[in-house]
Amino acid sequence: MPRSVNHVASKARRKKILKLTRGYFGARKNVWTVAKNTWEKGLTYAFRDRRNKKRNFRALWIQRINAAARLEGMSYSKLMGGLHKAGIEINRKVLADLAVNHPEAFKAVVAKAKVA
């Protein structure tokens, strides 16, 4: 009895991956094994960088807060310590947004931290 293979499903699976790799350079877009490896590696990078994105944004917020705090004559660590003592629970994302888009509100927050 001859071997039975489901060629339709195999071709559909390969076609699906090759469709996902459109726009890649060279053999990465049309050679099955190269395209599959590239696509899998891309998923690995995506998984890793979804986690790294959170670290990068936190670092960016801290840099922005530090720069704005130093314009007000305070370091980042003194500002955060003062906010903690004053009982002001405001996260770094919002603080960075205040520093960039609403400097007057940020100055008011810094003033409260200085008093504490």
Curated annotation (Swiss-Prot):
Q: Does the keyword Transferase apply?
A: no
Keyword terms = Ribonucleoprotein, Ribosomal protein, RNA-binding, rRNA-binding
Q: Which GO terms describe its molecular function?
A: rRNA binding; structural constituent of ribosome
Q: Which CDD domains match?
A: Ribosomal_L20
- Cite the InterPro entries for this sequence: Ribosomal_bL20, RIBOSOMAL_L20_CS, Ribosomal_protein_bL20_C
Q: Which Pfam families match?
A: Ribosomal_L20
NCBIfam families recorded: rplT_bact
Q: Which PANTHER family match?
A: 39S RIBOSOMAL PROTEIN L20
Q: What does this protein do?
A: Binds directly to 23S ribosomal RNA and is necessary for the in vitro assembly process of the 50S ribosomal subunit. It is not involved in the protein synthesizing functions of that subunit.
**Similarity field:** Belongs to the bacterial ribosomal protein bL20 family.
Q: What protein name is recorded for this chain?
A: Large ribosomal subunit protein bL20
Q: Which organism was this protein described from?
A: Bacteroides fragilis (strain ATCC 25285 / DSM 2151 / CCUG 4856 / JCM 11019 / LMG 10263 / NCTC 9343 / Onslow / VPI 2553 / EN-2)
Q: Which gene encodes it?
A: rplT
